[in-house]
Amino acid sequence: MIGSPFLAGRDRYERVMEGWVDSGHGEAFTHTVQITDPDGGVEVSLVCTPSPGYEVRAAGARVRSGAADPGIAADFPDLAGTRMVGGFGKRLAELCGVRSGAVLFVDAGIEVARLARQVTKLPAAAIAGLDPGDAVACWRLDTTGWVDLPDSCFTYSPAGHALFGTRPVSTPMVPTLYSPPPGAPKIFTRKKVARLVLTARRLHLFHSMHDNVHGFDLHYEVDLDRGVIVAADSVTSRLPYAGICNEPQARIKSLLEQPADAQLRKRIQSLIGGSSGCAQLYDLTADLLKLLSLPVS
């Protein structure tokens, strides 16, 4: 049976994430994420090094509202020394356990790791003379500043790179994201809103994400009687490389008539993710599926 523990006793659920990055005076950044839903709110703040280390230098958290266990927040400093790479989500889950509010704290930590992939600290000489509108130059800086970008999505694949020079490509990337001034506050800000709406025998899933370089608004509709996705739509108002990032967005339609089962979480990796897909489209969809209880086929 398709459902969601977050819809228990209600037909609508909304979760809001707000995150931002402050540039420290050394090599590290401070990433702060707040997540709020009808049952409470939490905040996680990690001081981390940029790519390639992604090392947590200091960690803190707090309960902002609701019944989340403050003991989880008290344990967050134990993350110091952890790297935000493969296995970080498991480390967060182990830290938080099954205590009240653990889900929000874990998800906030994961969002911090995602913020860390949006900013870096290259030498000032690397951005000297950079024209913010020079998409090719920004793309090259991307693959220099973040070691995990190559082949992470279509744009950073050889096929995506080959499209430069064949069509107009624009970018909102700016020098501050590559080499920010020491102590600069909120050099990158992000807001995400996930929403579940139950309407008769249809379950609507919404997820939006807006930040300095992305603008996504996703909608899926699940027919609960048939157990399949009957609508899949996305509006992209801002992309890191408009003209190239647009290419994989149509892959969202590959989810039409897909069974809404537990295996869908794995199938979307090849349907909308990987080197032929879009990492943000995949993450936004995967996060919606995490909110659901899905049957095993």
State where each predicted segment sits:
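Active-site- and interface-proximal helix/loop "cap" or "latch" segments in soluble metabolic
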Residues: 2-164, 210-297
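Short, compositionally biased leader-like segments
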Residues: 165-203
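Two-metal-ion RNase H-like nuclease active-site motif
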Residues: 204-208
